[in-house]
Amino acid sequence: MASTDPMTRRFAVACGVLSQYVKANSSQPSTAAPVAQGVSGLMAAAAAAAAAPVVQEPGCEVDGGGQQFTIFYAGKVVVIDRCTPAMAAELMRFASAAQGGGGAPEAPPALVDMPIARKASLKRFLAKRKATPASARSSYVVRAAAAEEEQPPAKKAKADVERREDWLALGSLGHMHSR
C-alpha cells in the first residue's frame, strides 16, 4: 500500500500478518481464487482469509461452522465467513499488536470555518434579495398610498368618515348581541 496515513499502514500490516498466520496454520492448501491486481492489499488479505479453512485450536467448540466476522475500515466492509470465536479473538490480537499500543483514536479536526461559511452564505443571500425588486407586500403598500394621493380631497374625507363609521358599527354590533 502506498498510503501515508499511519493508521492505514498499521491496518495493512495487521492484515498481512493475519494472512501469513492463516496460510501457515492451514493444513490444506488455499483454494482462494486468484486475486485481481487492481485489488488493494486489504481486500486481498481478506479474500485469502475468507477462503482459507477454519483453524480449530484444541479445546474450542465449533458451532455449525462458525459465524461471520465483519471488519469495517476506510469505507470498506470485509466479511469473513466461518469464523470461530477463537479465530476472531486471534484477529483482534493481531490488529491490536499491529496498532502499536492501541492508543486512543485521533479526533477529527474541528470544523472551525463552519460559522464563517454560514455567515458568507447569508451575506450572499441578502445581497441577492436586495438586488431584486421590492417585495410584493411593499409594492402593494406603495400602490395603495399612491391611489389615496390621486383621489380628490372630497373623496378622501368621505373615505375617512366611512372608516370611522366601520369602527362604530363594530361597537354597535357587539352591543346588539349583548341584549
From Swiss-Prot:
Keywords tagged on the record: Jasmonic acid signaling pathway, Nucleus, Stress response, Transcription, Transcription regulation, Ubl conjugation
A biological process from GO: regulation of jasmonic acid mediated signaling pathway
Organism superkingdom: Eukaryota
Annotated ranges, domain Tify: 62-97
Motif (Nuclear localization signal): 117-124
Pfam families in the record: Jas_motif, tify
Mod. after translation: Ubiquitinated. Targeted for degradation by the SCF(COI1) E3 ubiquitin ligase-proteasome pathway during jasmonate signaling.
Any one Gene Ontology cellular component term annotated for this protein: nucleus
Keyword Ubl conjugation tagged: yes
UniProt motif Jas: location: 115-140
Record SMART domains: TIFY (SM00979)
Subcellular location: Nucleus
Subunit structure: Interacts with BHLH148. Interacts with COI1A and COI1B in a coronatine-dependent manner. Coronatine is an analog of jasmonoyl isoleucine (JA-Ile).
Purpose of the protein: Repressor of jasmonate responses. Involved in tolerance to salt and dehydration stresses.
Family: Belongs to the TIFY/JAZ family.
Entry comment, domain topic: The jas domain (115-140) is required for interaction with COI1.
Name this protein carries in UniProt: Protein TIFY 11a
Organism this protein belongs to: Oryza sativa subsp. indica
Gene name in the database record: TIFY11A
